[in-house]
Amino acid sequence: MDIQMANNFTPPSATPQGNDCDLYAHHSTARIVMPLHYSLVFIIGLVGNLLALVVIVQNRKKINSTTLYSTNLVISDILFTTALPTRIAYYAMGFDWRIGDALCRITALVFYINTYAGVNFMTCLSIDRFIAVVHPLRYNKIKRIEHAKGVCIFVWILVFAQTLPLLINPMSKQEAERITCMEYPNFEETKSLPWILLGACFIGYVLPLIIILICYSQICCKLFRTAKQNPLTEKSGVNKKALNTIILIIVVFVLCFTPYHVAIIQHMIKKLRFSNFLECSQRHSFQISLHFTVCLMNFNCCMDPFIYFFACKGYKRKVMRMLKRQVSVSISSAVKSAPEENSREMTETQMMIHSKSSNGK
């Protein structure tokens, strides 16, 4: 996507940090690619997360700590998908926001809530799997669930504390040919922005990644030790399930979140080194990389149901049962409606024949 965007625009030429620098010169390509991408994210994310939520609600009496963290991931993603139609319209219009600054702030709030709630709950899932495998006797099931409830509340409070200030500052900006919303250039005048973003990247990405990797390495060590001591444990499948969950979380985390945060860190270091004076071509390249990496990061919304699929016991069986039930209901409805339609057609035909014969008399 980024290569395609890069090949379909003429690099803008202007003085560094100049007002003549068009950072949205790639809008003709972006207005096609980005709405298609986000439409796909909207459909897959909404259907997948709603399906997961239905399964959770139907089995709420059997909830455990893993299910609880996964539930919060699902709720965060459903909230995010509700804001996508406005973003799709924004990108389709070539980065032009025409529905007011208030709605721009709200969509920005939802976007950042989803991003960092997702990161935090993925971290919680990794820690939960770590406790279940490495220290299974330290916390019993009841204590773990009660502890998980408190952690979930704390995570939401933390995320809202980080994102609510977005409602205070304007998120839209009048450009020469458009009104932009939630774009990086809208924040460039913020004092100490590079340090703020570097700090946010450390807290919201680097630290969770370190925790996830530590949990993963400890779980691997534990599984290998257990397999050596008792080969029968491999047949139970419990350790394999825990390993699959952690591997999936790491893959999703790295693929979705790493490119965006690396792009931010790299650009902020450049700004600090060159005292905020960057060439227009450098700023434009960064803007394109942001649009691409944000698309990749938001695809996380579609991957979270798969995390739930692997992490939660019996989810696959319950989903397949629901789908089979739905198909059988559809087939039975079609079978029942067929005789009714045939009898209705026969009645109408008989009435027409009777009417014609009466007219003939």
From Swiss-Prot:
It is found in: Cell membrane. Expressed abundantly in lymphoid tissues such as spleen and lymph node, and in B- and T-lymphocytes. Also highly expressed in lung, heart and gastrointestinal tract, and weakly expressed in the urogenital system and brain. Expressed in astrocytes. The chain crosses the membrane at residues 32-57, 78-95, 106-127, 150-168, 193-215, 242-265, 288-312. G-protein coupled receptor expressed in lymphocytes that acts as a chemotactic receptor for B-cells, T-cells, splenic dendritic cells, monocytes/macrophages and astrocytes. Receptor for oxysterol 7-alpha,25-dihydroxycholesterol (7-alpha,25-OHC) and other related oxysterols. Mediates cell positioning and movement of a number of cells by binding the 7-alpha,25-OHC ligand that forms a chemotactic gradient. Binding of 7-alpha,25-OHC mediates the correct localization of B-cells during humoral immune responses. This is G-protein coupled receptor 183. Gene3D superfamilies: Rhodopsin 7-helix transmembrane proteins (1.20.1070.10). Changing residue 291 to A: Reduced localization to the cell membrane and reduced receptor function. Changing residue 21 to A: Strongly reduced localization to the cell membrane and reduced protein expression levels. Changing residue 112 to A/F: Strong decrease in oxysterol agonist-binding and receptor activation. Keywords: Adaptive immunity, Cell membrane, Disulfide bond, G-protein coupled receptor, Immunity, Membrane, Phosphoprotein, Receptor, Transducer, Transmembrane, Transmembrane helix. Changing residue 297 to A: Reduced localization to the cell membrane and reduced receptor function, without affecting oxysterol agonist-binding. The lineage of its organism: Eukaryota, Metazoa, Chordata, Craniata, Vertebrata. Residues 126-134 are annotated as: Interaction with G proteins. GO terms for molecular function: G protein-coupled receptor activity; oxysterol binding. It comes from Homo sapiens (Human). Residues 340-361 are annotated as: Disordered. Disulfide bonds join 104-181. Changing residue 297 to I: Reduced localization to the cell membrane and reduced receptor function. Reduced oxysterol agonist-binding. The keyword Transcription regulation does not apply. Changing residue 114 to A: Strongly reduced localization to the cell membrane. Homodimer and heterodimer. Heterodimerizes with CXCR5; leading to modulate the interaction between of CXCL13 and CXCR5. Changing residue 87 to W: Slight decrease in oxysterol agonist-binding and receptor activation. Residues 58-77, 128-149, 216-241, 313-361 are cytoplasmic. It is a multi-pass membrane protein. Changing residue 104 to A: Abolishes localization to the cell membrane without affecting protein expression levels. It comes from the Eukaryota. GO terms for biological process: adaptive immune response; B cell activation involved in immune response; dendritic cell chemotaxis; dendritic cell homeostasis; G protein-coupled receptor signaling pathway; humoral immune response; immune response; leukocyte chemotaxis.
